[in-house]
């Protein structure tokens, strides 16, 4: 469920919307996070403020704040106007706080759910994005940012080791700092019968100081959709790898919604590398309802033991998994509702439901 309202003050526009999707699922997966006794800790929602002409020269200001039951994210972005043939500059400041379930979560109920491992991450980043002018099919973004990462326990205190005494940071101190140069390229090809999307991200840690993290990481997502009469067949392949210095929180998490359904978040595994494949067949039943059948599979490519502290092995994660299922999607003028039923390789069944955002700030 959700609500949205727009307020106009001159050229400024404020959008307020509430979204229950992620938070209802999270309440079934995570243990109680800190400040549970505070009534405000149960407040969930999003606040978005946009100004299209901040200083009278078409400068754009974007401020968003998202709060869930267990996580929060604050983003401030300022975009300067440029000619169409030049890259658009955006200055971004972001702070997020969330439980680290994907890496340090503990699988329960035959890996169908993940419980809290008592580790949370506070991330602060400051940087600049350069959005290159898009060609007919290609677009790209280059960014450079400073990141400061602090592991916290459920009481909000800084920690440098997990409950088993293994380091949570690469430096061994209560925090990690790094400067990251990132290049993202996107390719899109569409026609009346099919589409193909490809996204490639490459990140490089720059050694500004001797104790800062040096690494190279890449991720890719390729998806292909084909119309088969009234039905749509969608296939998706994603993966990545990281070399160089590494903290456990930088590992690739496998399992959960958007990865391998039928498993809890990160319950399949976490490694230096990963590969996930998804296939889905959807068929409209009427104008507002469609049925869907899907199959997901993923693997850490036997790289779980290469993550510092080997959290996947200590938590008994299998390293590979497959999930099958079906579901319904309901479309209306108020948004989309979806219900998915999945079964994993351990014959454990899971039910996923969601109410995606009714209003977006983008």
Residue ranges of model-derived segments:
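A short, hydrophobic secondary-structure junction motif
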Residues: 123-130, 206-207, 324-333
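Gram-negative/organellar outer-membrane beta-barrel architecture
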Residues: 2-199, 225, 233, 254-261, ...
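Extended beta-strand-rich architecture
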Residues: 44, 179-327
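Short glycine/proline-enriched coil/turn segments at helix->beta-strand junctions
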Residues: 135, 287-289, 333-335
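Conserved active-site loop/cleft motifs that coordinate metal ions or position small ligands
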Residues: 291-294, 329, 336-342
